[in-house]
Amino acid sequence: MELLTNFPLLSSLAAIIFAQVIKVPIQFIVSRKLDWSLVTSTGGMPSSHSAAVTALSTGVALEHGLDSSLFAVSAIFAVITMFDATGVRRHAGEQATVINKLVIDFNRFVNEAKDFPKAAEKEKQKKLKELLGHQPIEVFFGGLTGILLTLVLAYFFM
């Protein structure tokens, strides 16, 4: 049962859960809408990916030191993950927004066309997921969440 005593792993899992759950009240404060689906969705404030990888790196640093090979690997993994969250995934989300708008505009055009034969049953279209990546501030606070949560957990459990 060494897995249950693996501090970097447990702190990463705690950071993911904390970051996902805290999205609900943050969104409620911003929009006055309670959306529990945020607990299981990607994107949003804070980034749970960033929280997880920074918690992992912080946990490894606390257990093995900043000069260890394990810390080097986890730190580079964290940098790549956070870069991807603000880069490729964010741009994919922005493209999904544009594509979804194009689909809406196209459907409106088709529905308004005079000679368009009405189908017996309209085919439902699947909307592309737009909230894929993160704004840099979301990644920053996700990373900060992971570090601070791991330090608090280390204080109580290490």
UniProtKB/Swiss-Prot annotation:
Any Pfam family hit: DUF212
UniProt topology in membrane: Multi-pass membrane protein
Record-annotated membrane-spanning stretches: 10-30, 137-157
Chief location bin: membrane
Matching InterPro entries: DUF212
Record's keyword terms, sorted: Cell membrane, Membrane, Transmembrane, Transmembrane helix
Location in or out of the cell: Cell membrane
Any one cellular-component term (Gene Ontology): plasma membrane
Name of protein: Uncharacterized membrane protein YuiD
Organism: Bacillus subtilis (strain 168)
Lineage of source species: Bacteria, Bacillati, Bacillota, Bacilli, Bacillales
Originating gene: yuiD
